Amino acid sequence: MINLNVLEAARRTGVKKVVSFLSTCIFPDKVEYPLTADKIHDGEPHPSNFGYAYSKRMLEVQGRAYREQYGLEYVSLIPTNIYGPNDNFNLESSHVVPALIHKCYLAKRDDTDFVVWGSGKPLREFIYSEDVGKITQFVLKTTV
C-alpha cells in the first residue's frame, strides 16, 4: 500500500517522473543467468524474501500501469549488490564486497593468508554506489 500511495500522491500533485528502486531479490529463486528484467515474474522469489520481494515486484507492476494509464514516466531500476564509500565493513554484518575488502586488509596487516569462503561457483554482480548515482541522474534527465 505504501508504494501505491506514493505513486498516487505523485500523480495527483503533478509529478511527471518517478524513479523507483527495486531489489535483486525480486527475481525468482530458481532462475537462469544472466538476470534480465523479463525474468522477474517467472517464478517465486526466495522464501526468505517473500513479502519484501513481492512488494517490490508490485511497485514495478504499478509503475508500469501508471505509465500505460496516465502516460507518466514512472520507471524502475534494479541495482545489483551496491558497494562504496561509507559502506559497512563489519565482518559480522557487512555484505560481500566490504567484507572481502576488510578481510584483505586484515590479512595484509597481520601478514596472514587472504581466505575467501565458498566454492567460487555462485554468480554475483556488483555496482559502485557512485555509479548508481550517475545512472539515476541519467535516468532522471532522459525521456523514457
Residue spans of the language-model regions?
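Hydrophobic positions on the long internal alpha-helix
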Residues: 2, 6-10, 62-63, 135, ...
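Conserved Rossmann-fold NAD(P)-dependent oxidoreductase catalytic core, especially the SDR/UDP-sugar
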Residues: 4-49
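Short clusters of hydrophobic/aromatic residues that line enzyme substrate/ligand-binding pockets
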Residues: 33-37, 89, 116
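Glycine-rich "substrate-gating" loop/helix at the edge of Rossmann-like oxidoreductase active sites
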Residues: 48-52, 80-95, 118-130
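Active-site Tyr-X1-5-Lys
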Residues: 12, 29, 46-80, 96-110
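Alpha-helical substrate-binding/gating segment
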Residues: 68, 82, 97-114, 124-144
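Active-site beta-alpha turn of Rossmann-fold NAD(P)-dependent dehydrogenases/reductases
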Residues: 19-23, 78-80, 120
